[in-house]
Amino acid sequence: MRGVETRIQEIRHAVFTEVAKMAYEEGPVDKKIEALPYKIIPGETGNFRNDVFLERAIVGERLRMARGLPYRGAAEPAPVSDGIMEADKPEGYYTPPLINVIKFACNACDEKKVHVTDGCQGCLAHPCMEVCPKKAISLDRVTGKSIIDQDACIKCGRCATVCSYNAIIVQERPCAKACGMKAITSDENGKATIDYDKCVSCGMCLVNCPFGAISDKSQ
């Protein structure tokens, strides 16, 4: 997120710092890069996702991309250092594309969803129900609070607009919302995927992903 220093920036800085150090240190780069996920994510327990192995795998892909290497999915059995010796040349250039989704880091956020929060007061007017063009809102007969039928909802957001208590929210996938080219959709697993025919590599998805699942490459 722009203007806010988060743990995502902390990891990003650590990755690029360690990659930069490699240029000034002696020794084989393949062995160095294999050890770096353990240096950046030390210990026995995870710091961010409660799974230290997943965290190290994500950092491993970030390290590869920081060296300009291609992203690999979780199903590809290869060490972090795969291809690094060929890429470790002064005239080397990153392997396109520049912006990549690390699929196993993606939270598979809903593309768009309308929620009734605990702020609903169960008011008498129920303007949310009145303005819904698909009659997707009903009432809980015990509490009087609104319930949205997600199968019928078309995510127009009219209910959120008229709620006097701002108790209805429209959630959108942050990376897709930030993309001015509408280049981000979902794959068969609900993970974010980039249409590179539309993508202009602006990086807005990268800075807006709360899970740090989108990374860029360096040369």
What residue ranges belong to the model's regions?
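Ferredoxin-type iron-sulfur electron-transfer modules and their immediate structural context
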Residues: 1-162, 166-178, 182-190
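Flanking helices and flexible, charged tails adjoining ferredoxin-like Fe-S electron-transfer domains
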Residues: 167-219
